[in-house]
Design a protein with these regions (language model features):
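Left-handed beta-helix
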Residues: 1-184
Length: 184
């Protein structure tokens, strides 16, 4: 049992799953884990893709690089993208040439091309410093992030965002961008 009551402990628990011999060993012969799987195809790893120390779920397509990460079902990671130390939940799309460091990305998120996440100083989140911390980028479900933006550490983003939401193309470390429920 592990307490995952914070984003930091949730991230740590997922990173422990990809240890050589994880504390919570998914491969124990005497303690099998049974799940009812969806009927989806196996994951696809392109010939020139790179994957190391990661869990890649069924239905996922990887054309870029994935390092030390946990990737959910049905995710698409496009060519040139580099994912490090991150958790990406099901049905999300990561754009071409994105660089994502230490992020938790929820379900059904679309990230445009040439996006960089996890840059800058490790300063506390201004809105909820006890929640959005640990140097993580946190992206809520059904969020859209436009192409060509940079996102700092200890940030939170939710909703359908546009380039205008990123002054100078940047969401600085410690900032929160909440567009949930907004309509045009």
């Amino acid at each position: 049992w592990k307490d995952v009551g914070t984003l930091g402990s949730y991230w740590e628990a997922n990173m422990e799953l990809i240890d050589i011999i994880p504390e919570f060993n998914l491969y124990e012969e005497f303690w099998k884990i049974y799940t009812k799987g969806d009927i989806i195809p196996p994951q696809y790893i392109a010939a020139d893709a790179v994957v190391d120390r990661s869990i890649i779920s069924e239905g996922t397509e990887v054309y870029g690089e994935v390092h030390n990460s946990v990737i959910g079902a049905g995710v698409t990671i496009k060519k040139g993208a580099v994912i490090r130390d991150s958790i990406i939940m099901k049905q999300s799309v990561i754009g071409e040439n994105d660089v994502i460091d230490k992020a938790i990305i929820a379900e059904n998120v679309t990230v445009g091309d040439n996006v960089v996440m996890g840059i800058g100083e490790d300063i506390p989140n201004k809105l909820k410093p006890n929640v959005y911390s640990f140097g993580l980028v946190t992206v809520g479900e059904n969020t859209v992030i436009p192409s060509d933006v940079k996102i700092g550490k200890n940030t939170a983003i939710v909703g359908e965002t546009t380039p205008e939401d990123y002054p100078g193309g940047v969401l600085e470390s410690g900032e929160t961008l909440n567009k949930e429920g907004e309509t045009e």
